[in-house]
Amino acid sequence: MKLNKIYTKTGDCGKTSLSGAVRVDKDDMHIEVCGSLDELNAVLGCLLAQDVPSDGRKVLVQAQNLLFELGALVVSDFAMQQNLATFAAATLELESSMDIMQNQVEMPGGFILPGGTWPAALSHLARTVCRRAERQLC
């Protein structure tokens, strides 16, 4: 997705546009979801700025690209139904990658307190933002 400008000069008065020039309130659920997806993408970017193994880096970049595509679909509403199969396949691929990585480490038996290392803390933050976006989408 290419953005020409980051401002519109239209004076939004609490409104914004979805694709197709549909005007909605800035607290519309489409905008809330896009904000959460954008926040998740930013947290993943912070995580990628850390020392991440190449297999994890590949999965994170793949997730970032999917988040951009999902955000575009959310604001285009009508196209979303047509593209859900694409995201279902991509989700399965990401889950498969996560399963492989999970099998490479010993998993604790209970809940994990956020923290430890900076990448671990960012991973926990990404998880919580992702769960919020998921709740908003459903």
What are these regions (language model features)?
Residues 1-138:
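Phosphate/pyrophosphate-binding loop motifs in nucleotide- or prenyl diphosphate-using proteins
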